[in-house]
Amino acid sequence: MLAYRSPSRRLQRPGGALLAGALVSAVALLLTGTGAAAAAPPSPDEPVRSGHAWMGAGTRIEQGPASSAAAGITPMDTSGVQGIDVSHWQGAINWGSVKAAGIDFAYMKATEGTSYKDSRFNANYTGSYNAGLIRGAYHFARPNVSNGATQAGYFASNGGGWSKDGKTLPGVLDIEHNPYGAMCYGLSTTQMRTWINDFYNTYKARTARDVVIYTTAGWWNTCTGGWTGMSAKSPLWVAHWGTASPAVPAGFPTWTIWQYTATGRVAGVSGDVDRNKFNGSFARLQALANNTP
């Protein structure tokens, strides 16, 4: 920590070396796209503040925050088309460095519930696009706050839209173990199915795309009762850390994206970041972005 200096001393000689150094530092931050180290998400025994959940905030309740490390699996153990998912918890990101590290796609948090917009979404969405990544947005579901249609509309209006520009992936419904309370948000399996279907239908009507579903096998099988109703409509993004092959929820024939660790490292990102693998070639990733066969 820097030693304290009185304001009067720090403001002396505005044309001097102190001011010049500050200006150089500010310019360097703008040029590199990096900033102060990101704040770490709450530890497993700390509550998550409303609006501040992230992709995997509930998954860690099921699977443990360090299960990838415990299994000895490192990010580079998985080859193929690689991606990351981020939120405000990662702070400022140097997307040029991320791209240079071999990352092809990224998803970033846009919204949660009906009132929260991620503070880093605009910077992440624009920065990743400018760096040449294929990117998309995700919505952290709060089924106990409103119906699915309302949240899908909020998401589509605040970052979850889609355009056929070759760089925009369909939006994601992040629906996982509730990090704020009861696992299934107080809904029955029938109510949860209705909620998810309403979200899907509204998002489809707004964007003409099938929403991607992020979940775990454990949550889906418990909270939807192993529902098969989405398997022919939504691509599956499954979270399963610390394993060589992910468990797929009932009803889904396979996975499209696999989040295989919550403790990955990538140049340009401060601290841990979720790492993901796309199930297919880069050409297939482009096809998903363009909505082509």
Each language-model region and where it sits:
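Secretory targeting and sorting signals
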Residues: 1-40
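Flexible, glycine-rich phosphate/dinucleotide-binding loops
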Residues: 115, 144, 220, 245, ...
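Functionally critical loop-and-helix segments that line ligand-binding/catalytic clefts
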Residues: 41-91, 229-293
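Catalytic domains of cell-wall/extracellular-matrix polysaccharide-remodeling enzymes
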Residues: 167-251
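Substrate-binding cleft of extracellular glycoside hydrolase catalytic domains
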Residues: 73, 77-200, 204-206
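Short acidic, gly/pro-rich beta-turn/loop elements at beta-sheet edges
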Residues: 94, 147, 223, 248, ...
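Short alpha-helical interface patches
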Residues: 6-9, 88, 95-100, 176, ...
